[in-house]
């Protein structure tokens, strides 16, 4: 990093800017080398100012939320990592709608909706991470996905804030089509009025299911691989005899085989090597190529 780069970024941001920030502090897997710059914008206009400088200088950048679905290599990230954790406002709108910013957690969103007597988002109960990340990967469970409920999406791309309505969104299984460099800022959800006790009952049911099936007990990024069409990744991994397989500090969970866990002292390289072993063994046994759901970034 140069003094000029540092000076320009500091001048552009009202929020916090850190230097050589270990990404292990900001990923659910607790691995990852240092980011050159780690920025925490105060609000969307602050992010716009920061992005204007980043784009002008042609710097690589990465937006993070709760650090789930993310693996940062041991060499870290050469550029600016941007945290949207300050973007956490939520509000009820007329006609059973709710607006939430990207830095709100999924659990805050579920609880806020319930508090407003709105139903539809209960299936997100227990899914870790933030709303921006859930939207970006079309997170879901129990046959539901979050983008099914989105009326509009607010994004920042090329320094311009844009609102895209449902009919113009392109999405699929664990995927939202975004333009290069487009950042999700907020969404408006179209929900339905419901009884608070019934909503709470569904929330508790989903939480209990997740506790029983996914309480893995160690740092993890959530599901590491996407489910191939008509198949379950965990079953393919289990059938390949990989339950409990361990490389360094990275292990295939004994509880849920699509969760790779940090048993302590793991490096990103351990997870990368373990992922390759899993893909090779599954391909060898079933002929199916697994695709990572976790995003892999950074340098070795």
UniProtKB/Swiss-Prot annotation:
Tell me yes or no: is rRNA-binding among this UniProt entry's keywords.
no
**Which keywords appear in this protein's UniProt record, sorted alphabetically?**
Cell cycle, Cell division, Cell shape, Cell wall biogenesis/degradation, Cytoplasm, FAD, Flavoprotein, NADP, Oxidoreductase, Peptidoglycan synthesis
Q: Which InterPro entries match?
A: FAD-bd_PCMH, FAD-bd_PCMH-like_sf, FAD-bd_PCMH_sub1, FAD-bd_PCMH_sub2, MurB, MurB_C, MurB_C_sf, Oxid_FAD_bind_N
Where is it found, in Gene Ontology cellular component terms?
cytosol
Question: Might you give the EC number(s) for this enzyme?
Answer: 1.3.1.98
What is any Pfam family matched here?
FAD_binding_4
Catalysed reaction, written as an equation: UDP-N-acetyl-alpha-D-muramate + NADP(+) = UDP-N-acetyl-3-O-(1-carboxyvinyl)-alpha-D-glucosamine + NADPH + H(+)
Role summary:
Cell wall formation.
From the Swiss-Prot or TrEMBL record, give the protein name. UDP-N-acetylenolpyruvoylglucosamine reductase
What organism is this sequence from? Geotalea uraniireducens (strain Rf4) (Geobacter uraniireducens)
